[in-house]
C-alpha cells in the first residue's frame, strides 16, 4: 500500500514560516520513503495556499523521489487550459512526479459536470496533439461550434498537413489546438473527490482515481470507496487502472474517532489495512498537522513498513 502525507495550509500567521515548515516536512518525508505529498488549495486567510501546484513546483526542486499532488483543486472561475498547464509544469519540473486531485462540484457550489468536463478535457489534451472539446462548461477552442461532437474530438486527416503559419490570410483561426508543453507522461495521475454521488459514479465509470478525503468519516469513506469499486466492476473497469485514496487523521498513541486512526502503531496499521481490504484502496494519506518531533520517522518505521510489507 502506498503511503502519503497531506497538508492544509491556512491561518492568519505569516505565510513564510508556515510554508517553510511544510516544505521541510515534505523534504523529511522524501528522505523517509513516503510515496506522496499532497498540498490542499486553501483560500481566505493570510497563509492560504491558493496555487498548490506552484507551491509543489518549488518542492520538486528540493526533493528526489516523492510524488507531488495538488489537492482539492477548484475549477470554479478558472480557465481549463490554465489548470491543465499548471499541472503540466509541476510534472515537468518534478521529472514525472506531478499530479492533481480536483475538488468535487458540491464543495465548490457548482454542477458536478463542470468538474467532470475539466478532467476529461485535461486528460485528452495531455494525451494527444491537436484537439477540440465541446461541453456545457468547457469549450476549446472557445469558438468551437455547437455542431461539434460532445467531448473531445480530433483533427481529421485531409490528405496533407499544412502548418498554421502557412495558412495565409484565407484562414487564420484554428479549429483544433494542441496544449503545449506536454507532461512527462500522457497519463498524469488525476484524482477527484467522491463526496457527491454524481461524481462518484462518473469517476467509477470513466477510470478516474477516487479520493476519499479527511472530511468524510472513516465509515463514510469506506462506504463510498466500496460503492465506487462496485460500479467500476459492473462496467468492466479494473482496480489496477486507478489509485484509490483514503485520507485520514492519525493519532500516534492517541484516541481513535470517526475521522482518526489512533492507538498504538500496530493498532493504526491494522485499522488502515482493514479499511483497505474493505475498499481495495491502494493509497493511504495522513492529514498531517504539527505534532511531536520525530512523528514522521516513527510512523515510517512502525506503521508504513507494515502497510508496505
Where are these regions (language model features)?
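Acidic (Asp/Glu)-rich catalytic clusters
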Residues: 27-31, 56-65, 87-98, 202-205, ...
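N-terminal small/glycine-rich loop or linker at the start of catalytic domains
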Residues: 1-15, 170-186, 250-259
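Alpha-helix-loop-beta-strand connector modules within alpha/beta enzyme cores
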Residues: 50-70, 121, 301-309
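Internal, glycine-rich beta/alpha segment that forms the wall or movable "lid"
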Residues: 79-206
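Hydrophobic faces of well-ordered beta-strands that scaffold small-molecule active sites
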Residues: 3-7, 37-39, 68-73, 98-102, ...
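C-terminal helical cap(s) of enzyme catalytic domains, especially alpha/beta-barrels
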Residues: 114, 118-123, 221-231, 292-309
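N-terminal beta1-alpha1-beta2 module of alpha/beta enzyme domains
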Residues: 1-63, 188, 289
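Short, acidic/polar
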Residues: 16-28, 86, 194-201, 264-275
